[in-house]
A protein has these predicted regions:
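Structural alpha/beta surface segment adjacent to cysteine/selenocysteine redox centers
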Residues: 23-131
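C-terminal cap of thioredoxin/glutaredoxin-like
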Residues: 3-11, 15-37, 41, 108-212
């Protein structure tokens, strides 16, 4: 059976610990897949109502959002940190900083226009979840420059509302697909894989999509 190229769209948020784990498991499946795959990262906000410009320690943010105790939050973070370690990610969630990620997603779309969408997604996830960086404007400019997006372009984009439309388009498309949580993978606009599934689930989905 001839294997055709597979197009994968991934809805993800850069503050989502399971999205980064899902990315690693998906990459393991990609490494073993013979066919050609084109990956496009799409924007999704776990917390679209987070106040813009407010940076809050993630444990405090989660405790308030979920009505959970600090101990419960620490327990949950410990569990996800252990899973992340299995795919080679060293999370520092207790020190991580939550924020409204809309501007970060605009930067991701700017990076995508330079052909750096996947690299940018990786860099911002690592900055938030592993390095516990505060993703304010200067930091977004610096991280984008690190991967090859000129600083003045990022500054210009963040000073206005460029790429806001593209980010909202991703949200609309997610709603059309019925995406309620991330990561969410759509293969050839036909097959959906929800969550940070085991690598073999992604491998199976890739085979299925490739065979049409």
């Amino acid at each position: 059976v001839p294997v055709s190229a597979v197009r994968v769209e991934v809805w993800s948020d850069i503050v989502c610990p399971w999205c980064y784990i899902g990315k690693r498991r998906f990459e393991s499946a990609l490494a073993e897949f013979d066919g050609e795959v084109e990956v496009e990262w799409r924007s999704f906000q776990l917390d679209p109502n987070a106040p813009v410009g407010r940076f809050q320690p993630t444990p405090d943010h989660l405790a308030a959002k979920m009505g959970a105790s600090r101990e419960q939050v620490e327990g949950m973070m410990g569990q996800v940190t252990a899973v992340a370690a299995e795919v080679g990610l060293e999370y520092d969630l207790m020190n991580s900083v939550s924020l409204n990620t809309f501007d970060a997603h605009r930067v991701l779309h700017l990076a995508k226009s330079h052909g750096l969408g996947t690299v940018a997604h990786e860099r911002l996830m690592r900055a938030n979840l592993v390095e516990a960086r505060t993703l304010d404007t200067p930091t977004l400019v610096e991280l984008a420059a690190e991967i090859g997006v000129p600083a003045q372009e990022t500054e210009r984009v963040l000073a206005g509302d460029e790429y806001a439309h593209e980010v909202r388009e991703d949200f609309s498309q997610a709603r059309r697909y019925g995406v309620s949580g991330v990561p969410f993978f759509v293969l050839n606009s036909a097959y959906g894989v929800s969550g940070a599934q085991p690598t073999e689930v992604f491998a199976q989905a890739l085979q299925q999509a490739a065979q049409g």
